[in-house]
Amino acid sequence: DLMGETYDASLMPDRLHPSSIGAGRMAMHLCHYLEPTTEKANPCTFAIPGNEYRSAAGWKEGADWHAVSEEITQILSRKKLDILFLGNFITQGFGGSRELVTYKPGKAAVDSCFKDLTWESAGISGDRTENLLWRLRHGKYGTSKPAYAVITIGINNVNAGHRAADIAEGICAVVEETRKQMPETQILLMGLLPAGLEKTSPMRMKCDSIHSILQCKTWGDVVYVNPTSWFVQA
């Protein structure tokens, strides 16, 4: 404990040097001091690569965010898909054919449900909207020409302390970039999975606020799904 507060070892494992998560937290807070004062920038829409490197992210030892991102790009450049899953750790857990991903708890279920379809997971552990936005712009995912793209992103922005309105704007930016890169693809946007044990927990309330914003959007041919009821008992 530090002055009565519980020490968060995920941020500074050796109590001196920040982890990738801690470095991201530092950068986010520094941004508030260094950004122009005339207009507050939205970090959720500013496309940047990720900074994760830990094997605990479900990757082979020695792999980092850039290696994992490049593997996705290479895989998608070689195949045409029926379904492309875009997202973070939840989507990464579907597995697909990626060799750098060692933890694939959802692969058997996805294989069973979509056994007659060609699909791939482009999820990366720890990714926020701004990281997926960067990958969409630089990874040339559109070469796989998926019939469907399923997007699940934003919970790590909640964890990072971003505002609900900013997160919703970041999610919308991801949808629009997907439309731009894959104009013939049908997009299914799956909203945030519920977080927090209680309805009144700050994380749950922020997720609900994001759902409320997204549900009011005019999506056109994009299908928006709120999965909260799949996991939460009334």
Where are these regions (language model features)?
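Alpha-helical cap/lid subdomain in secreted, periplasmic
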Residues: D1-K40, K104-T118, D127-E130, W134-A234
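N-terminal secretory targeting modules
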Residues: L2-L16, S20-L86, I90-S112
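Conserved beta-strand scaffold positions in the cores of enzyme catalytic domains, especially
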Residues: I83-F85, W119-S121, Y224
